[in-house]
Amino acid sequence: FVRNRLVVVTPADNPAQLRRLQDLAKPGIKIVLAAKEVPVGQYALDFLDKAEVDGSLGAGYKDAVLANVVSYEENVRSVLAKVALGEADAGVVYSSDAAVSEGDVQQIEIPDALNTVATYPIATLSDSSNPDLAQQFMDYVLAPAGQQVLEKYGFIGAGDK
């Protein structure tokens, strides 16, 4: 019913002056990622793997970025908080998390070819105690008005590519 994608975030004042993905590989940049045991952490590593194979961000990009990682956090909110507070120069988070922190962080887009899109399904449970209400919720979320609400919060709507 909705999808999410990765973005790189920097503190709002962006003291490291990061403007493009290549800047993450500069020596001395402090990066935080989520631990690989959580989906966003694995997706961040997938992005680096794709960038390494693609080559468009430069040879040795993955190793250079990983050398700049100062911590692996247990969840995406911790990554976002460390960046927003200026404890790190950059982090990789979901676009939906960055959207709700507008003003606290800046975003650097990750191209589709290097990104991983998380897909969230929706369904009513067969043993739901209120199947009619569950269906009404699904109908709303999948309708244009519901999709607009989700897009406002940084998600990719079901009909968008």
Where are these regions (language model features)?
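Exported/periplasmic ABC-transporter solute-binding proteins
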Residues: 2-161
